[in-house]
Amino acid sequence: KIFDGNSKFDVSVVPTGNWRGMVMRTDTAPFDNPKVRKAVRLAVDRQELVDLVMGGAATVACDTPVAPSDQYRLDMKCPQDIKQAKKLLKEAGYPNGIEMVIHVSTKEPTWPTIGEVVQQQLAKAGIKAEVKMTPSKSYWKETWMKKPVAMTRWNERPADSALHEIYHSGAKWNESYFKNPDFDKNLSNARGELDFAKRKAAYQNAQKTLWEESGTMIP
């Protein structure tokens, strides 16, 4: 931004697959209910996060970890939908909303700001979120994959690696403890498929499943 308007510099913005997100453990109530998880994700205004946290220099991900430039990425629209979020919470048995604690740290400079913006957005859907700062030195050992809701970050990976390493039921770093047989099957089918169109369809079906049931909100 400091070079904008300066004729001495030619500024180019190149999309990458690096991302930050908020993880809900799918094995822990109330996030063990997919309707609750989707309600939380629907309550988030992703474009506002991109604008406020990244100064507009980011791409809305709609909860897929696949990079914007990846040939297997599924492009989706995911506008904030407070009405639907409230409806899903009611169907899940939480007509008055839920309470949650978002654990952040300065391990990643953007996490505290993401937490604060998400906190304000969730309130519109009746979700009361507390943002709790945790020690940076012990974040990966004592907070990540331990607390019900915590922040995460990943660098760009090929579609197959990103989907397997973060979401496959048997993956070591399945940080949201996500388990979905159809998702795993799509990944397996994609790896064994020689036809590009069919392989792409399998990877994109996996991403559709993440949009419906994922425990990870990727702005």
Which residue ranges define each predicted feature?
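Periplasmic binding protein-like
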Residues: 114, 119-168
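Residue-level signature of the cytosolic catalytic core of signaling kinases
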Residues: 32, 78-81, 179
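Generic, well-ordered alpha-helical scaffold segments in large soluble proteins
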Residues: 39, 43, 52, 88, ...
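Periplasmic-binding protein-like
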Residues: 13-24, 69, 171, 175-184
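Alpha-helical secondary-structure segments
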Residues: 2-6, 17-61, 86-88, 98-111, ...
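Extracytoplasmic/peripheral linker and loop segments enriched in polar/acidic and small residues
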Residues: 35-38, 50, 124, 129-139, ...
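A local structural motif
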Residues: 8, 95-102, 119-134, 198
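Structural transition elements
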Residues: 59-91, 108-113
